[in-house]
């Protein structure tokens, strides 16, 4: 059972740590398209990996700077498997993808480029929430930051794909949920006949008080309502759903529902990408994971002194806590501060 101190520590931690994530690359039919998170790439990437927390902000559309096109556009066709690759820092085997405390759902939206850039016409084509006692983000971490969708049979043209993570480690308070998203520029070259529905506006698809946004993951729960519209069934037209939280109900698939092993590739072949199931299953009751704050402010108790040995933890990195097995010595000039029993962090002395 969580303590008042634990909640305060979790809230306090939000302002310092940056164990966050962005999309670094995309794979098409298991072929690595190379790093895309730069001005000469194909991902409209923000200047850093900080989250968006104001659901009314225009940055919710494609993140900070997301209205600015980038140099490249990936060519895809209906039926192609598109895999998004998230990372905390770099495309390396040692990268932790995102803090293990940042549990929550993973979703993908699609919109025609012009409408999507303006914040309109967004259609949810995939989602994964909480099922069988496991969060979508846990699956993402286990699969080395990869999750996949199948391109629907839409008309030829330019579109944006918008993968999104909602981290709920501070979702117990209004404004605490953290949103991570980017927009990937793609050009559909096949002549599909299934026009996207009208979609929803982003911002506008979520409210700060939606049950799937304002959600306490540290108390026992039996299900999780994934926020936003329902997943498009891939064939119907018209509205794709109203804003608010979608109940965990079965929908006709718009994307592949079976995980397929990837081909060996030069970058990170250690895991198989998750392929989303468009139907969410009712989650079973499970004891929630112990809170592990991922962010903080300069308060809390000092749990250890700073250090300068090789392999020391950098500023804002985790340096201790229950069940933590990594390095505990901070770089010179830093101290390891205890925010709660589960999360200690290197901060300025």
From Swiss-Prot:
Gene Ontology molecular function terms on file: cellulase activity; cellulose binding; metal ion binding; monooxygenase activity
Transmembrane residue ranges: none
Family (UniProt): Belongs to the polysaccharide monooxygenase AA9 family.
Official protein name in the record: AA9 family lytic polysaccharide monooxygenase A
Any GO BP annotation: cellulose catabolic process
Domain CBM1: 311-347
Free-text comment on this protein's domains from its UniProt entry: Has a modular structure: an endo-beta-1,4-glucanase catalytic module at the N-terminus, a linker rich in serines and threonines, and a C-terminal carbohydrate-binding module (CBM). The CBM domain is essential for binding to and subsequent oxidative degradation of polysaccharide substrate.
Top class in the EC scheme: oxidoreductase
Practical application: Lignocellulose is the most abundant polymeric composite on Earth and is a recalcitrant but promising renewable substrate for industrial biotechnology applications. Together with cellobiose dehydrogenases (CDHs) an enzymatic system capable of oxidative cellulose cleavage is formed, which increases the efficiency of cellulases and put LPMOs at focus of biofuel research.
Residues at which Cu(2+) binds: 20, 102, 180
Matching SMART domains: fCBD
Organism for this UniProt entry: Aspergillus fumigatus (strain CBS 144.89 / FGSC A1163 / CEA10)
Signal sequence annotation: 1-19
Cofactor-binding details, from the entry: Binds 1 copper ion per subunit.
InterPro entries xref list: AA9, AA9_LPMO, CBD_sf, Cellulose-bd_dom_fun
Cellular compartments annotated: Secreted
Predominant place of localization: secreted
Task performed by this protein: Lytic polysaccharide monooxygenase (LPMO) that depolymerizes crystalline and amorphous polysaccharides via the oxidation of scissile alpha- or beta-(1-4)-glycosidic bonds, yielding C4 oxidation products. Catalysis by LPMOs requires the reduction of the active-site copper from Cu(II) to Cu(I) by a reducing agent and H(2)O(2) or O(2) as a cosubstrate.
EC number: 1.14.99.56
Residues the entry annotates as binding O2: 169
């Amino acid at each position: 059972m969580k303590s008042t101190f634990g909640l305060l520590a979790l809230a306090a931690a939000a302002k310092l740590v940056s164990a966050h994530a962005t999309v670094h690359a995309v794979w098409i039919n298991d072929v690595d398209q190379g790093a895309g998170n730069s001005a000469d790439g194909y991902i409209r990437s923000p200047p850093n990996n900080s989250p968006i927390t104001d659901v009314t902000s225009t940055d919710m559309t494609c993140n900070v700077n997301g209205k600015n096109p980038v140099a490249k556009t990936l060519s895809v066709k209906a039926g192609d498997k598109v895999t998004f690759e998230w990372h905390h820092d770099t495309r390396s085997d040692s990268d932790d993808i995102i803090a293990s405390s940042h549990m929550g759902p993973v979703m993908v939206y699609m919109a025609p480029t012009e409408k999507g850039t303006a914040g309109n016409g967004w259609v949810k084509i995939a989602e994964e929430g909480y099922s069988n006692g496991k969060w979508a983000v846990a699956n993402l971490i286990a699969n080395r930051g990869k999750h996949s969708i199948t391109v629907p049979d839409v008309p030829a043209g330019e579109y944006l794909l918008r993968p999104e993570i909602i981290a709920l480690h501070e979702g117990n308070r209004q404004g605490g949920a953290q949103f991570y998203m980017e927009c990937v520029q793609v050009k559909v070259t096949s002549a599909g006949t299934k026009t996207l529905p009208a979609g929803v506006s982003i911002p506008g698809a979520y409210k700060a008080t939606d049950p799937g946004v304002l959600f306490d993951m540290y108390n026992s729960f039996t299900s999780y309502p994934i926020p936003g519209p329902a997943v498009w069934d891939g064939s119907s037209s018209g509205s794709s759903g109203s804003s608010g939280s979608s109940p965990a109900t079965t929908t006709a698939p718009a994307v592949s529902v079976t995980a397929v092993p990837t081909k060996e590739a030069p970058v990170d072949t250690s895991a198989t990408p998750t392929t989303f199931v468009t139907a969410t299953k009712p989650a079973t009751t499970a004891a929630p994971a112990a809170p592990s704050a991922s962010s903080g402010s300069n308060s809390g108790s000092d749990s250890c002194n700073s250090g300068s040995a090789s392999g020391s933890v950098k500023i804002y990195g985790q340096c201790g806590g229950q069940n933590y097995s990594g390095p505990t010595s901070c770089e010179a000039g830093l101290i390891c501060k205890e925010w709660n029993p589960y999360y200690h962090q290197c901060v300025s002395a």
